[in-house]
């Protein structure tokens, strides 16, 4: 049996052999691995890119106080980004399942059409859910547009739901029963479970998300992050320096967009935003994402798209 961390190490080793740069998660609160700068921005423009990483993901509304066996407000995704998307991407994915010890002939693996869209990032793609014996464990996406910019070439994204896949591999019904790691100490096998690591966090973060977050402070934070992103894009209050020099700082601005997006998610979980306001807030974040995407594209174009000379992909 693979432990939770052995499963991650196995995926790391497998995608390393496929030429991926093994990166670290972005050190900000995000709702999915797609929001990582090395997926969202790297999908823009013609430069090749291959990367893989674990991404802790937060979705405040999905918290259940640690009482639901398979629903979490904090969970993990394993993200693989291949640009341009190789013709054998499905073969590569199935190979990763075999590396995890799955017998493809003994298990029911289905690809169910499920096109993907992220309104706040102005991104969408054609894709499939991957179902393993009736349970969704992976999302496949061929990015068509990111930040309002058409993807040329197409980027292939593979997003594993690590907890769900691990629950099947370990044959447990409750995520908190997953074996995170095990070792032998004084002749006895010791185990650390997912619940040991994260159950208290789920209880307390759910309590904060739904009951104790300060909406007044959160609304102020949203306005601050939005304003800072605008300033770094050369518009809004205090944007004179960026506007005069023509310097738009896409990467710092994108971090502000991500902070604004997470703040919005906290407000949404708290029930502080009406249905009408929700659409308006999403539109504001999407507008910033598009500005950042264009600024990033322009900055890479000004450099002559330097990674286009790398024939076999891009390793960091």
From Swiss-Prot:
Pfam families: tRNA-synt_2e. It is an enzyme of class 6 (ligase). It catalyses: tRNA(Gly) + glycine + ATP = glycyl-tRNA(Gly) + AMP + diphosphate. It is found in: Cytoplasm. Its EC number is 6.1.1.14. It comes from the Bacteria. InterPro entries: aa-tRNA-synth_II/BPL/LPL, Gly-tRNA-synth_heterodimer, Gly-tRNA_ligase_asu. GO terms for molecular function: ATP binding; glycine-tRNA ligase activity. Keywords: Aminoacyl-tRNA synthetase, ATP-binding, Cytoplasm, Ligase, Nucleotide-binding, Protein biosynthesis. Its main location: cytoplasm. GO terms for cellular component: cytosol. The keyword Ligase applies. One of its GO terms (biological process) is glycyl-tRNA aminoacylation. The keyword ATP-binding applies. Belongs to the class-II aminoacyl-tRNA synthetase family. Tetramer of two alpha and two beta subunits. This is Glycine--tRNA ligase alpha subunit. It comes from Cupriavidus taiwanensis (strain DSM 17343 / BCRC 17206 / CCUG 44338 / CIP 107171 / LMG 19424 / R1). The lineage of its organism: Bacteria, Pseudomonadati, Pseudomonadota, Betaproteobacteria, Burkholderiales. The gene is glyQ.
